[in-house]
Amino acid sequence: MHKTIYLVTDDAKMDFDTLYHKVEMALDGGVKLLQLREKKSSSREFYNNALKMKYLCKKYDIPLIINDRVDIAQAVDADGVHLGQSDLPLTVARKILGPEKIIGISARTVEDAMLAEKNNADYLGVGAVFPTSTKNDAKVISEKVFHDIQAKVSIPIVTIGGITLNNASTLINRGVNCIAVVSAILNQDNPKEAAIYLNNLFK
């Protein structure tokens, strides 16, 4: 997961057809990972939307990660799942999905991060690194905690939370290799241009 833009969707912001169109533009701009997060949808809607996104991701040859729902990830044969601390335990998700699937874990403390690595998580989602309006319960972690996590684990770290076109370079200058964004791409009139801009920051 080297120098990558990771796009996370938000079904609270727009209808699925609009989202699909914006995601396609973002993938065209070089987004390399997509996480489908559906907090409002029924299981049937989530499943149908995940299938559509899977075909889109296949077209661009990038992984589709499902937020929270191991059952949906399994049902559509997605590339992986991203789990929070209150979701199904990583070890259980691994038994269900198998060794080949990507499993990411949200971590806000060094202890969470080390346990996730011990249990063979593929990457960590660490944040929020800035205040964010996308997740109301997201608390900002200190730069010290972030660096402590970096120092203690060797698996890839994805930074998330409040990352915008204006502050992304601050993180990249700190040596961050992967940033996860929502609004920074999906709220733009031209998601492709936003994705290109973020990718260029790594250069």
Where does each model-flagged region fall?
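Conserved N-terminal beta1-alpha1 strand-loop-helix module at the mouth
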Residues: 1-88, 95-123, 141, 148, ...
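Short, electropositive alpha-helical surface patch
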Residues: 177-184
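A short acidic, helix-capping loop that chelates divalent metal ions and anchors anionic groups
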Residues: 73, 130-136
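Short, histidine-centered active-site or binding-site loop motifs used for metal coordination
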Residues: 38, 128-130
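A short glycine-leucine-enriched loop at secondary-structure breakpoints
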Residues: 161-162, 175
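A short, polar/charged loop-to-alpha-helix boundary motif
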Residues: 88-89, 132
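As written
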Residues: 120, 174-177
